[in-house]
């Protein structure tokens, strides 16, 4: 209807020419040359056909918004004198208030384009007022409320300042928050145009800290007041991830006037950092030059210059352009709808057509989101806002969400008092907040601002329990320390002198039977000299040290001796204890090992040591050392071949461990005396029993110059590490002796000279491997590493163990190797048993198969189970006999082997035919053959068919059979068949046979004997039974024959078997078909 009416009005042409005067009231000193924008808007409307001959606009421009409200007078003059029937503006809120109220009385429309006051949204007062400005107080309040609800906040505080402008804004925010269910928990009011220092000194920030975590800032001066307030917040330490600051941006200038830009446009990072962790709500193009470029291009494309325009008021120009378009479009729509050319005089009607209208604005074609103008239900522009997050320590502003209006249906804004739209929040970014998980802060602490929401009873009780536990732990520690001291004082390792007795050498040899046993070591004399018995039956070896003064053990000594007493490992010799402060001697006792020391083994030439012994001994020593190095004891300290004992299981047990350091200290204190055996110039390997040879060089050098030159003094202070590296050196010496049965020095070397060379740092004399052909090169390198002069370069005991096990192919101790050999033997034995068992099973299978060929399967199974098979009478079975015709003649002209070969060949074929047709061969006697079916397994009536099929196949086989040694002679047989009752059973125990008995057998035999060559003779009973159940067989009457013992009997010839097609043809013939 509207379209047709519009076309009709256009056709009127010259008949209806309406020219409306529109008055624009600008502002003195703002938006120069605003009439240029209005003229551009009018030209665009004319191009679009909105304005034309029937409807045109005349624009009158006047200035207002001065100090004396001259804009109000200008408005009255325009209406009464100049005939203006619509207003655009005034620019400022105060004058727009007066002009809009008069326009309501005059019933003419007013389009505001810069005023932002919330009061203009009341359409009960401003009935003909529409606004196209992007930012208004009430829309910003709606945007702030939508953002707050979107992030789940329900409690906020408002920060504002004194003054009418701020009061009006706060009132608008409070009303919207109340409508949206947002509770304003606190409102602070600052002095207008105050500074950051004054804000901090006012104490108001502390009030915010104690009442809110989400704060909305609604100041009269958006730029200046927010700048000072956020500086105060930052200096007060409240600008962090626990607070959210929401800044609704009412500034209408471009981003050149952002608060962190100076007067000359310079960027101020320190000011911007004050705005960190805040949300700035602005139109969707805020903090951007998005509108500037398309605005200039649009004006220049229309032939206008932008040089005389104020680009900082770009929003004002855009709104002014959109205001004229809104009015013209509304008038055109009104005229089209009413058909009355004077309808533009009805301001209320024109205002109604400004509601819910959407049209392109000045920059809508440039892809700018805010370029399109959408009016709500009370002719207010529905804005498109965005929330911008200001990240800390960054020069950018991040858009995190957009708030787009969505119009509501079934809503009348004139009744509800609002624009009938909702702001829909769309997230553009998440996880941006500088918290641990990126989540925004809650609107209040979990326990409230005064901890009123948390029950601390559990926490207090828990704290008391924790405190009690700590006290108990302290008490337990003190008590355990006391108990430990008591336990140390109890000295479980102490052995009183009266509790053991030493054994003389002769007595020991008698006890161990050394003299009579050839398997014992002959060099155990030194070992058995130090033997004792503790208690009644515990044999021990001991070391005796003369004691000069009483020994008082310190805590470290007591701990070490307790640890030695508690040490348990397969390759450690148990420490039995010590006897001290008695009889002026100190005795250290260890468990006795019956096979002596490894030194006795090495230097006994009667004993042969192969690689298995080498690997097992070295492995045991490394395992023992590895345990000591990883235990609390920490080291051995005096490793020598005679401190490696061999138990009765040929396992190495390390002895004398851990005691070297205390002995050295006690000797320096003058408490005991340690005796060192010096063998002088004795060069035999077995006599060089001196521990000094196994001491590393750093332990023997006693000159300060040598110590400082050869090693770092700080390392020497580390006693445990020093002792461990000394163990590695000593292990290298012992391993060389095990492998080569000699010390790692040239033959003929004097022991005393060796020790002197080692002590003297000016001469180089080190152990070396002289015969390197017998062992792996890597093992040689390992030995040399163990003897390295620098202790820090020597390998760890773990590396030594892994390398020796790898190079010597060690797989356990000697007992382990013997067990593996026994296990291998057992596995071989099991394999042999399995093979023999398999052979036995295979023989059993062959025997079972052979037995199954001699006897029926059922009978064979019963006999194998040891059960007897009773004779049984079968009511109906069929027996067949066969006989080779002329067999005697053939045998007379053949050798026995040829006869056997012939019979084996023909009977093998017969056996296959018998098995094929479910028959059983009872026996063969020479050339005679007895076959039965239905015995021993009954098969109903099938026995006659099985025998007939078998007989026919035997005849067929003989037609193609040739005697191997007589190709020209044809083999012929006679067959006889009879059906009847048969008795069967097993006869004999040694060679059991399954035999058939009864008249049926005799008759079958007579049928064979009276038959003719190459023919199958059947008795009357067999023929009748076959014809009754199986008519496919071709049987013809022979006549009467004389059977021995039976007299004359009637017999038949079995000629063959009809095929299925012949059977069908015969049946059809009988039916007459």
Swiss-Prot record:
Gene name on record? gcy-23
Q: What's this protein's name?
A: Receptor-type guanylate cyclase gcy-23
Membrane topology field: Single-pass type I membrane protein
Q: Where in the cell is it found?
A: Cell membrane; Cell projection, Cilium
| Taxonomic lineage from the root | Eukaryota, Metazoa, Ecdysozoa, Nematoda, Chromadorea
- How is expression of this protein distributed across tissues? Expressed specifically in AFD sensory neurons.
Q: Read off the domain note.
A: The protein kinase domain is predicted to be catalytically inactive.
**Glycan-linked positions:** 336
Annotated Pfam families:
ANF_receptor (PF01094), Guanylate_cyc (PF00211), PK_Tyr_Ser-Thr (PF07714)
Q: Which residues form the signal peptide?
A: 1-15
Annotated positions binding Mg(2+) 2: 883-884, 927
Entry keyword annotation includes Cell cycle: no
Origin organism is Caenorhabditis elegans
Q: Which InterPro entries match?
A: A/G_cyclase, A/G_cyclase_CS, ANF_lig-bd_rcpt, Cyclic_nucleotide_synthase, Kinase-like_dom_sf, Nucleotide_cyclase, Peripla_BP_I, Prot_kinase_dom
